[in-house]
Amino acid sequence: MSESQPPRRGRFPLPLSATTPVVRRFVSTGQAVLQPVPPRPQRPASEITRETARPAILAGHGLDSDGFRARMIERLRADGCRDEHVLRAMSRVPRHLFVDSALAAQAYEDTSLPIGHGQTISKPSVVARMLGLLRQRPGGAQLGRVLEIGTGCGYQAAVLCRLASQVYSIERLKALHDRARENLAPMRRDQLRLIYGDGLHGHGPNAPFDAIIAAAGGHAIPQAWLDQLAVCGRLVAPMHDAQRGTQVLVVVDRMPDGSLVQHRHETVRFVPLESGTSDYKPA
């Protein structure tokens, strides 16, 4: 995901009318073929001192204070985020409980952090941006059934639970699936279902979805995701842009007539979208 950068002018909101849309109508001609994408980690793990992955239980560290989250929210608001529903949801989720204790002091900074297995937790501004875009779907801001591709440590799923009535989150790495389950257990969110599986195929049993959000990017949007998007639904995902030679945020809307319309937004940096599952756990 996008790396830490020097302060810049506000990025929120960025209405679709303010962009130069690339409109495409998709024709279902079979499964989209993904080509290998060079790894694009949000932040090299070597740049950050870390210890063996374990939940950040930080009694006495002071990070349980609401003040830390409040300051994070104020920074997002100052940067231009105007979706108060997203900001309120993020203010209620303790991000430090989803990262390793060695990194907890950085939990409320606007930076991505490693969570092991070559994956990262998204920086708060990226989470706010993508969720804000998700809520601007043609069917309205109220989200019903949402599919998250790439559970990771579970942080974004926890935020989504405060914005949607049903959240399905799928993770291909068993170790991260288990970690997310452990992280989310104390929150007891009845509307959340965690799935261990190949996110490349979406999650057909509970489709269609009002919204689909992905935490990894490939060369094309998988056909399964498009097929599982409800009428008036919206998909937000990173995708490789051949013209720019980098990843961009892509928004795909299923219009009332069933057609699919795509818009491309700013440059981002996400880990690559991969197929299959892995139950590998380090010794």
Curated annotation (Swiss-Prot):
Q: Show the active-site residues.
A: S122
Cite the CDD domains for this sequence. AdoMet_MTases (cd02440)
Q: EC number(s) for this protein?
A: 2.1.1.77
Query: One MF term from GO for this chain?
Result: protein-L-isoaspartate (D-aspartate) O-methyltransferase activity
Q: Name one GO biological process term.
A: protein modification process
Gene Ontology terms: cellular component: cytoplasm
Keywords assigned: Cytoplasm, Methyltransferase, S-adenosyl-L-methionine, Transferase
DNA-binding in keyword set? no
InterPro entries named in the record: PCMT, SAM-dependent_MTases_sf
Offer one Pfam family short name for this entry. PCMT
Q: Quote the subcellular location field of this record.
A: Cytoplasm
Matching entries from HAMAP family are given as: PIMT
Role description: Catalyzes the methyl esterification of L-isoaspartyl residues in peptides and proteins that result from spontaneous decomposition of normal L-aspartyl and L-asparaginyl residues. It plays a role in the repair and/or degradation of damaged proteins.
| NCBIfam families in the cross-refs | pimt, PRK00312.1
Q: Which family does it belong to?
A: Belongs to the methyltransferase superfamily. L-isoaspartyl/D-aspartyl protein methyltransferase family.
This one is known as Protein-L-isoaspartate O-methyltransferase
Tell me which species this is from: Leptothrix cholodnii (strain ATCC 51168 / LMG 8142 / SP-6) (Leptothrix discophora (strain SP-6))
- State the organism's lineage: Bacteria, Pseudomonadati, Pseudomonadota, Betaproteobacteria, Burkholderiales
